[in-house]
Amino acid sequence: MINCKRIWAAITAAALCISLAGCGAASSSSAASSEAATVESAPASSAAAQEEAASPETAATGLRVAGLKGPTTMGLVNLMDSDDGANYTFTMYGAADEIVPLLVKGELDAAAVPANLAATLYQKTQGQVEVACINTLGVLYIVENGDTVQSVADLKGQTIVTTGKGTTPEYVLRYVLSQNGLDPDADVNIVYCSEATEALSQVQAGQATIAMLPQPFVTTALSQVEGLRVALDMNEEWQKVAGSQLVTGVLVVRKDAVEADPDAFEEFLNGYAASVEAANTDLEGTAALCETYGIVPKAALAQKALPECNIVFERGEQMKTDLVNYFQVLYDADPSSVGGAMPADDFYYGV
């Protein structure tokens, strides 16, 4: 068996040699901002990680779990570092689309991924995967260099710089605006940037005062721009109008992996739940592990960001309710964002 700690050590060594070595805006934003938009940029380590995940020796071990840098994997690190973690193979990838073919081919068993990607995988595999739990709620925040915005209504007539045009951040923003009586095309000027760093640079230069950004990039931005503050938590604003939680990430799993040993999978989920609890109570220890495993570039950044990343372990009926409502909003905006159709009931594990 290949011990997961050795796998992660190799991946981390490569990852920390590249841009993650610093804690500046560019390095800290790449995981969170792109994760919110469903796709992440691949680091130099991704090829090695993919090769490790697909090797015959790795395939012979227990559950093979993939993760991405950023909030969707932060809740897993305590399990990864535990003695029980040696029973599983954890591999980190630089981009969500690297994980898709491996899950489809059965070279991975489970993955912590953006929620809408899980729905797309369900369609792509003709129902061969299911969602086991929600691991991350909303990570989007409206920040302002000023004190004008106290409610969504205050965004009328304002310019908002953000990322993710044609992806989930756009759909979330437009939904919250419209449900608060604002026309996203007439009442607000939304300027889309290619990266969160570009959006922040406009705020820094005084070209804009309001931006919608993801964690943990928000934490870095607050330390870099004097007077910048969190004006609105988009998770809270979503709850007000949707009556459910805004979802960012989930754990998706192949049904055949669960059926092969249902008790073992439940044991994994129990360990996952304990790991999430530790992530929310032992911030310092979890933050250190996030740096060790290359999930967040610096422990100090992770420790500040963790309370705002809305890391959860939600399963069962509540999971289904939150996901169905979330997927419906995405489907109404663009059916392809959830794979072209709403997932059927068999997509929701244990419900």
Model-identified regions with their sequence ranges:
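Secondary-structure end/capping motifs
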Residues: 258-333
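Bacterial lipoprotein signal-peptidase II cleavage site
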Residues: 22-35, 39
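Pocket-lining segment of extracytoplasmic ligand-binding domains
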Residues: 116-117, 198-290
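Conserved C-terminal helix/tail region of periplasmic/extracytoplasmic solute-binding proteins
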Residues: 324-351
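Short, glycine-/small- and polar/acidic-enriched structural segments
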Residues: 37-42, 51-185, 190-192, 209, ...
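A bilobed periplasmic-binding-protein/Venus flytrap-type ligand-binding module shared by bacterial periplasmic
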Residues: 78-79, 140-150, 245-264, 315
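Short, solvent-exposed loop/beta-turn-alpha elements that line the ligand-binding surface or hinge
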Residues: 83, 236-244, 311-320
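Sec-dependent N-terminal signal peptides of Gram-positive bacterial secreted proteins and lipoproteins
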Residues: 2-26
